[in-house]
Design a protein with these regions (language model features):
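Short beta-strand scaffold segments in enzyme catalytic cores
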Residues: 50-55, 61-63, 145-150, 156-158, ...
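Short, small/polar residue-rich loop motifs at catalytic or cofactor-binding pockets
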Residues: 46-49, 142-144, 163
Length: 183
């Protein structure tokens, strides 16, 4: 057991020794299969995020974001996905938001939280809030990415400043919408 439920890779070997965990050489983790996956990902320069937002029948909003990660990233890097307010945010007063893109910009600007704040304090619609954050905060800093969201009334919206963003939605009547490029 530990007092620190959250750590990064920084000093992970020291932490593992303190916890009396078995240590193995780093080469242990390099298999022909993992090396092939790494080389393939490296050549494609692609990564993907899976995000979801939901409104249940009781009016509760939820958001989740699972990152595909950035290959060849600096060790110990923590992206925006696990940081509430940066890459993921939900508040029953307004909306649920999940983000994808260059995480450092989302962290520095608390992007997901600001969608909520714009709706709460400025009374912007969900779509207006998404558009404002992307166009007025991310884009001027050369930050790229997109957001999906649902508001407390069940309105679904998304906005992005990239060539495309895969997304899908389904309403309470089972009507599905799947899109890739158009905003």
């Amino acid at each position: 057991s530990t007092l620190f439920p959250y750590t990064t890779l920084f000093r992970s070997a020291v932490f593992a020794k303190e916890q009396q965990l078995e240590l193995v050489p780093n080469e242990y983790f390099i298999t022909p299969e993992s090396k092939e996956r790494f080389e393939k990902a490296k050549s494609m320069d692609k990564h993907g995020t899976v995000g979801c937002v939901a409104l249940d029948m009781n009016g509760n909003l939820a958001a989740g974001t699972s990152t595909g990660g950035m290959m060849l990233k600096k060790y110990g890097r923590v992206g925006d996905s696990p940081i509430i307010g940066a890459g993921t945010y939900a508040n029953n007063q307004t909306c649920a938001v999940s983000c994808t893109g260059h995480g450092e910009y989302f962290i520095r600007n608390a992007v997901a939280f600001h969608v909520h704040a714009l709706m709460l304090y400025k009374k912007l619609t969900l779509r207006q809030s998404l558009q404002f954050v992307v166009d007025s905060v991310l884009t001027p800093q050369n930050g790229t990415g997109g957001l999906i969201a649902v508001d407390k009334k069940g309105n679904v919206a998304w906005y992005f400043n990239t060539a495309g963003m895969f997304r899908a939605s389904m309403d309470s009547n089972g009507i599905k919408k799947i899109e890739m490029y158009s905003k």
